[in-house]
C-alpha cells in the first residue's frame, strides 16, 4: 500500500470502502477499493482472486480499468482508474433535463462496454447508475464489472444499505440461477428509460413482490405462450393478468419512436427475447449517431 497515498474517502461501495488516492511514483490519481470479505479467517478465496485477475485483461474505453490487485494478509485492495462522478450524481446535477443527444451517447457507450465484456463471457449482473462512471470528457465507463461473479451478488451492502432491485429482470426476481448476458440487457433498458427521464427510475420497487408488480403493470403480465419457462422458475408465483400499457409515450415522453422501440426490445420479460448489446448497437435509434 506504500505505493499509493490515500487522499480522501469517496464513499461506500457494494463491497467495501472506496478512496481517492495518488500513485506516489507516477502521481496518477486512482480509486482504491478495499474489499471486505465475510469469512475473515479464510482470507481471500482463490476463486475470487482468479476472477479478479481475469478482469485486469478487460481493456476498453468504456470499462473502468483495473490497474492493480493488492493482496495482503486477508485484505484485498483493487486499484481502479479514477472517474469524477457516477451517473446518479450526474443526474442530480442536471436538474431534470438531459439533452437527447447525451442520452443517446451515454446509452451507446453503455452498450459498447457491455458488448465488449459479453463477447468475453463476462457479465456484470448488478448494473445501476451508481456503477456507471462519467469522467470530465463525458465518457461513460462501467465499474465493478465481474465483481458479482467473484464475490457473489450481495443481498445488502455491508453499510446496511439494501442492494437495489430496481434494475433486476423478472427472471432473476423469480429466482433464476442460470444467468446469461440478458440480465445486463434488462438493466440497460431500465437505465435507458432513466436517462430519457433525466434521472427518474423506471421501476422503483420496495421489495421483490412490488418490483414484479411494477414491471407487469407496465409491460403486461407474461402469458405461458410469451414465456413458457416462467412457471418453472424456483420462486415463481402467479400475478394478476395486467394488460400491457399500449404505448410507452407517456412513460418516456422525451424519447422518440425509434428510441421507444429499442427500449421495448430491451425490456422483454422473457430473457430469450431480449435484444443483445451487439444487436442494440445496430438499432435504427443510433443510425444518425456519430460516436465521438
Curated annotation (Swiss-Prot):
It catalyses: L-seryl-[protein] + ATP = O-phospho-L-seryl-[protein] + ADP + H(+); L-threonyl-[protein] + ATP = O-phospho-L-threonyl-[protein] + ADP + H(+). Disulfide bonds: none annotated. Inhibited by 2-(1-ethyl-2-hydroxyethylamino)-6-benzylamino-9-isopropylpurine (roscovitine), 1-isopropyl-4-aminobenzyl-6-ether-linked benzimidazoles, resveratrol, AT-7519 and olomoucine. Activated by CDK5R1 (p35) and CDK5R2 (p39) during the development of the nervous system; degradation of CDK5R1 (p35) and CDK5R2 (p39) by proteasome result in down regulation of kinase activity, during this process, CDK5 phosphorylates p35 and induces its ubiquitination and subsequent degradation. Keywords: Acetylation, Apoptosis, ATP-binding, Biological rhythms, Cell cycle, Cell division, Cell membrane, Cell projection, Cytoplasm, Kinase, Lissencephaly, Membrane, Neurodegeneration, Neurogenesis, Nucleotide-binding, Nucleus, Phosphoprotein, Serine/threonine-protein kinase, Synapse, Transferase. The modification N6-acetyllysine is found at residue 56. One of its GO terms (biological process) is negative regulation of protein export from nucleus. The keyword Lyase does not apply. The modification Phosphoserine is found at residues 72, 159. SUPFAM superfamilies: Protein kinase-like (PK-like). The keyword Phosphoprotein applies. Its EC number is 2.7.11.1. SMART domains: S_TKc. It holds the Pfam family Pkinase. InterPro entries: CDK, Kinase-like_dom_sf, Prot_kinase_dom, Protein_kinase_ATP_BS, Ser/Thr_kinase_AS. Proline-directed serine/threonine-protein kinase essential for neuronal cell cycle arrest and differentiation and may be involved in apoptotic cell death in neuronal diseases by triggering abortive cell cycle re-entry. Interacts with D1 and D3-type G1 cyclins. Phosphorylates SRC, NOS3, VIM/vimentin, p35/CDK5R1, MEF2A, SIPA1L1, SH3GLB1, PXN, PAK1, MCAM/MUC18, SEPT5, SYN1, DNM1, AMPH, SYNJ1, CDK16, RAC1, RHOA, CDC42, TONEBP/NFAT5, MAPT/TAU, MAP1B, histone H1, p53/TP53, HDAC1, APEX1, PTK2/FAK1, huntingtin/HTT, ATM, MAP2, NEFH and NEFM. It is linked to Lissencephaly 7, with cerebellar hypoplasia: A form of lissencephaly, a disorder of cortical development characterized by agyria or pachygyria and disorganization of the clear neuronal lamination of normal six-layered cortex. LIS7 patients manifest lack of psychomotor development, facial dysmorphism, arthrogryposis, and early-onset intractable seizures resulting in death in infancy. Dysregulation of CDK5 is associated with neurodegenerative disorders such as Alzheimer, Parkinson, and Niemann-Pick type C diseases, ischemia, and amyotrophic lateral sclerosis. Heterodimer composed of a catalytic subunit CDK5 and a regulatory subunit CDK5R1 (p25) and macromolecular complex composed of at least CDK5, CDK5R1 (p35) and CDK5RAP1 or CDK5RAP2 or CDK5RAP3. Only the heterodimer shows kinase activity. Under neurotoxic stress and neuronal injury conditions, p35 is cleaved by calpain to generate p25 that hyperactivates CDK5, that becomes functionally disabled and often toxic. Found in a trimolecular complex with CABLES1 and ABL1. Interacts with CABLES1 and CABLES2. Interacts with AATK and GSTP1. Binds to HDAC1 when in complex with p25. This is Cyclin-dependent kinase 5.
Amino acid at each position: 500500500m506504500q505505493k499509493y497515498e490515500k487522499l480522501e474517502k469517496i464513499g461506500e461501495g457494494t463491497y467495501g470502502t472506496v478512496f481517492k488516492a495518488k500513485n506516489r511514483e507516477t502521481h496518477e490519481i486512482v480509486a482504491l477499493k478495499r474489499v471486505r470479505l465475510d469469512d475473515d479467517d479464510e482470507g481471500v478465496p482463490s476463486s475470487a482472486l482468479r476472477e479478479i485477475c481475469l478482469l485486469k485483461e478487460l481493456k476498453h474505453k468504456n470499462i473502468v480499468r483495473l490497474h492493480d490487485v493488492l493482496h495482503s494478509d486477508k485484505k484485498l485492495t483493487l486499484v481502479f482508474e479514477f472517474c469524477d462522478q457516477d451517473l446518479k450524481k450526474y443526474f442530480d446535477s442536471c436538474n431534470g433535463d438531459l439533452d437527447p443527444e447525451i442520452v443517446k451517447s451515454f446509452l451507446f457507450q453503455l452498450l459498447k462496454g457491455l458488448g465488449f465484456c459479453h463477447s468475453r463471457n463476462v457479465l456484470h449482473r448488478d448494473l445501476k447508475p451508481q456503477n456507471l462512471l462519467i469522467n470530465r470528457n463525458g465518457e461513460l465507463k462501467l465499474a465493478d464489472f465481474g465483481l458479482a461473479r467473484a464475490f457473489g451478488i450481495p443481498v445488502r451492502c455491508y453499510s446496511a444499505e439494501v442492494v437495489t432491485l430496481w434494475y433486476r429482470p423478472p427472471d432473476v426476481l423469480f429466482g433464476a440461477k442460470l444467468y446469461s448476458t440478458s440480465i445486463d440487457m434488462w438493466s440497460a433498458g431500465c437505465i435507458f428509460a432513466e436517462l430519457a427521464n433525466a434521472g427518474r427510475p423506471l421501476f422503483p420497487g420496495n421489495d421483490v413482490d412490488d418490483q414484479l408488480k411494477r414491471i407487469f403493470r407496465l409491460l403486461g403480465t407474461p402469458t405461458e405462450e410469451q414465456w413458457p419457462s416462467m412457471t418453472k422458475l424456483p420462486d415463481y408465483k402467479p400475478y394478476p393478468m395486467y394488460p400491457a400499457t399500449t404505448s410507452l409515450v407517456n412513460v418516456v415522453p422525451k424519447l422518440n419512436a425509434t428510441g421507444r422501440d429499442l427500449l421495448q426490445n430491451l425490456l422483454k420479460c422473457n430473457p430469450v427475447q431480449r435484444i443483445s448489446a451487439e444487436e442494440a448497437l445496430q438499432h435504427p435509434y443510433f443510425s444518425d449517431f456519430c460516436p465521438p
